[in-house]
Amino acid sequence: MNENEQATRTSGTTERSLPEEVEVAIVGAGPTGLTLAGMLSGYGIRTAVLDGAQGPALHSRAAVVHARTLETLEPLGVVGKMLGGGVVVPHFGVRDRDRLLLRVDFDGLPTTHPYTLMLPQDRTERILLGALHEQGGRVLWEHEAVGIRQDAGGVDLLVRGARGDGRVRARY
């Protein structure tokens, strides 16, 4: 890992201690977990996002962001940054050498985003992580959820962390 990758990787490491209790515990700091945490934090709901990784992903596992996903992300205020860092694709084609087998045009979709956006997932996650930080939320990196106990009042999430085991109590 070079210096830039290390600096980028550790920039996501913002909090190491487990909170005792939160409203919502979220397992995984991928696009879905970060989106949920960002939206809940925007409503003042305290979350704990737990992820066993050392920090944000360094490499992409996906690259396409669909129109409905962009609509969903609008309340977080991240779509402009995503568009600025990606490539808008107004149509999609499948070819067999020189022969076009299928063409899908997105401009007829009933959406404010009649296209797909090509943006590597690691960049998407960094943008979502930035939005979460702006809302006051954090990710607990190097904290892996290893068990759950549920009762009428919520859940106890059993966590294995870099500094030992612990638990987080959450209503949801």
Question: What residue ranges belong to the model's regions?
Answer:
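Glycine-rich FAD pyrophosphate-binding loop
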Residues: 39-62
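Active-site-adjacent segment of FAD-dependent monooxygenases/related oxidoreductases
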Residues: 58-135, 149
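Beta1/beta-strand and adjacent pyrophosphate-binding region of the FAD-binding site
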Residues: 15-32
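Core beta-strand elements of the Rossmann-like FAD/NAD(P) dinucleotide-binding domain
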Residues: 20-22, 164-172
